[in-house]
């Protein structure tokens, strides 16, 4: 049977690529570093390709990693759009709200 890429592996891969480190990605995804490393290792083994060059100061994408990153980013964006579409169809609020706040001065 062919290797099945799991969505959590795609999320882990994309975040590691964005952060440039497994440690940074682990923090962003609230995941332990060993779990993050295992997810990436399983993905690389399943794809039979090295996706990252591992260095003491982080990771960088290999050529295969660059290619997979382009596809993986699109997959995550499409998944987000599909989830938002379903929420809208169900009458739920969807989207993102940004709230800004100016300086706060204490009462005198």
Language-model regions, residue ranges each:
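Short alpha-helical "packing" element that flanks the helix-turn-helix/winged-helix DNA-binding module
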Residues: 9-16, 68
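Residue cluster at the C-terminal edge of the helix-turn-helix DNA-binding motif
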Residues: 19, 28, 41-50
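A short LG(V/I)-centered, amphipathic sequence patch enriched
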Residues: 44-63
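Base-recognition residues in the alpha-helical recognition helix of bacterial helix-turn-helix
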Residues: 11, 27, 38, 53
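Short helix-boundary/capping micro-motifs
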Residues: 14-32
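N-terminal winged-helix
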Residues: 34, 81-84, 90-108
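Alpha-helical linker/hinge and terminal dimerization helices associated
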Residues: 46-47, 68-90
């Amino acid at each position: 049977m062919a290797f099945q890429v799991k969505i959590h592996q795609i999320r882990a891969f994309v975040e590691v690529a964005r952060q440039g480190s497994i440690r940074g990605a682990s923090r962003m995804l609230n995941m332990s570093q060993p779990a993050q490393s295992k997810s990436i290792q399983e993905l690389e083994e399943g794809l039979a390709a090295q996706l990252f060059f591992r260095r003491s100061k982080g990771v960088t994408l290999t050529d295969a990693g660059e290619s997979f990153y382009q596809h993986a980013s699109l997959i995550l964006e499409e998944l987000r759009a599909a989830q938002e579409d379903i929420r809208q169809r169900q009458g739920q609020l969807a989207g993102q709200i940004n709230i800004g706040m100016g300086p706060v001065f204490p009462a005198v």
